[in-house]
Amino acid sequence: MNLHEYQAKQLFARYGLPAPAGYACTTPREAEEAASKIGSGPWVVKCQVHAGGRGKAGGVKVVNSKEEIRAFAEQWLGKRLVTYQTDAQGQPVRQILVEAATDIAKELYLGAVVDRGTRRVVFMASTEGGVEIEKVAEETPELIHKAIIDPLIGPMSYQGRELAFKLGLTGKQVSQFTKIFLGLANLFLERDLALVEINPLVITTQGDLICLDGKLGADGNALFRQAELREMHDPSQEDPREAQAAQWELNYVALDGNIGCMVNGAGLAMGTMDIVKLHGGAPANFLDVGGGATKERVTEAFKIILSDENVKAVLVNIFGGIVRCDLIADGIIGAVEEVGVHVPVVVRLEGNNAELGAKKLADSGLNIIAATSLTDAAKQAVAAVEAK
């Protein structure tokens, strides 16, 4: 679960991380009042969306008057911002962040993720701030410096100092960076985060370090014990279908194709998408109903898939292990009858009670295409789309 920049900076403040004075605003009037609270300009106004590339899309602007702030707020509040990280519809702008402008001498990068290889939280720092860290990692990996956090010990001051020296910091900047490093590490661990980025972490013309931007991603599996983070959830930034799927504990990701896929198991779901692509099709989604699929969840999965107007056929690929194929068949029949499916449905069942499930589908009298293998299922789904 991602947080907005203004929410990230609210948490930064609690952990002693310096950031520009700022306020999140929902109306043009609030934005003007925020400028008055901050003091004299210039100010920076930023659209709050869960996507990068805001600046290039016009969603970040340096302004010198309250009239410009009002104009920016009127331009963007209630509208949608399209960046290279969004789809063609963009993300809705419900708040803008008004904050004091900062005189920048140099831009740095500081971030942390969970490294699956070492099973540790890994901090990354670089002198190449203000650009995508993925690009730096690909083109100049030697410019990324790392610190691995031992889960039994936690973050140590010496790790912060080591990173500071590698970034070329001197004097008071070393102690400032170490404080930021320790605060960010404690924030990451105590709040069950999966990602944190300060990009850029800037050195001002006065020589001080300031967190100019903030990006936080919370571990969705830990939200049950992070009540405050749950309250920060902004469903407007999610695909409505993905949000609906989450309520039913379905793993759904919307894609750009036209063949809806319903599969049990993430690995099988990815394999199904691959083989659809191999035979000339384009998956409309990733959808894993999981090992505990019920008739109700299968019905809901169908509703979610068919709510995508681009879907021209549905491919159901079930390997019965924990889940019984006959229960899946009941769910498919119930969904087709309830929703009124008007696109071809191709079903491949294997494993636990597969024969019983296939018989139920055959006896239902519904227009369901039975597949003998995964390859056959993919070919039939692609053919069904091409025939429409």
Swiss-Prot record:
GO CC, one annotated term: succinate-CoA ligase complex
Required cofactor(s): Mg(2+)
Binding site for substrate: N264, G321, I322, V323
Functional pathway: Carbohydrate metabolism; tricarboxylic acid cycle; succinate from succinyl-CoA (ligase route): step 1/1
Cofactor notes: Binds 1 Mg(2+) ion per subunit.
EC number: 6.2.1.5
Gene Ontology biological-process entries: succinyl-CoA metabolic process; tricarboxylic acid cycle
Residue numbers binding ATP: K46, G53, R54, G55, E99, T102, E107
Domain of life: Bacteria
Catalysed reaction, written as an equation: succinate + ATP + CoA = succinyl-CoA + ADP + phosphate; GTP + succinate + CoA = succinyl-CoA + GDP + phosphate
Pfam hit, one: Ligase_CoA
A GO MF label: ATP binding
Enzyme class: ligase
InterPro entries tied to this protein: ATP-grasp (IPR011761), ATP-grasp_succ-CoA_synth-type (IPR013650), ATP_grasp_subdomain_1 (IPR013815), Succ-CoA_synthase_bsu_CS (IPR017866), SUCC_ACL_C (IPR005811), Succ_CoA_ligase-like_bsu (IPR005809), Succinyl-CoA_synth-like (IPR016102)
Similarity comment: family membership: Belongs to the succinate/malate CoA ligase beta subunit family.
Family matches, as NCBIfam families: PRK00696.1, sucCoAbeta
Protein name: Succinate--CoA ligase [ADP-forming] subunit beta
Gene: sucC
